[in-house]
Amino acid sequence: MPGLIRRTLLIGGAAAAVAAATLYWRARSQGATEVAYGADPRQVLDVTLPNGDGPFPVLVMVHGGAFQMGDKSDLPIPVDVLDAGIAVVRVNYRLSGTDPWPAQADDCLAAIVHLQREGAALGLDPSRLVLLGHSAGAFLAVSTALSLVEVGLSPRGVVSLYGPMDFSTMDADMATLGRVPAMGATDAPDSPESLLLGYPVAENRALARRMGPIGRLDQIREPLPPILIRHGDADPLVADLQAKRLREAWLAADPQAQIDYALVPGAGHGGEPFETGKVAEDILAFLTATLT
């Protein structure tokens, strides 16, 4: 019964709402099964299974795109994750140009609910699941993980790659590092973050903080899943101090949490440094440790 209650709460909340490491991000062009988790055309995910017999543990990947663009097909299916016996799920969600916050969070959570309900039929073991996101997708992956924690359905882990974590401090963090944001100020009315929220970040900084992972972590004092955080120390869009804030807030919420945090020297916002070499190796090791 407790499991049923937790599941009911989760469903209600959702409704209301890449040497060898290079292989990590090599695309696999076939074998993905498209699945609708809602009625909107953007509410779809795809599932790629490893060879062999399931059910398989799951890596759920959330694409970036400043909340206003992007598609799950932008994410290459990581072959060595499949080779490790882990299924790959890529999620689409509604975009801010047509659907403001919290539609994106609602969709990511609804996708997880769908996997929990229908995972067995898809060859998946949704009780063994890690969320991974890039950029805006990292914001959503971490947010979804926290929603799951809040209803007692914590994922096995989270991977956050160069994501914004607190809209209210993004400009200040860039200023601290002596940088000018390449896409303009987050506080501006036409920033991706302001357009997502439906109001300029500068006009309601407290609310902009409260809705994001850092603000939510302020209110959490319970066990959190392991997290891997990687961010370029030359990121021109999102200051690496956002990753540091995430690490510190995660630890404050759960002093016993397992946190694998590192900056990527010379790396900007995404690209090859996150697709090959050490970062790819680290992600695969994290997935293997938490899922298999």
Where are these regions (language model features)?
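Alpha/beta-hydrolase superfamily serine-hydrolase fold, recognizing
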Residues: L4, L9-T292
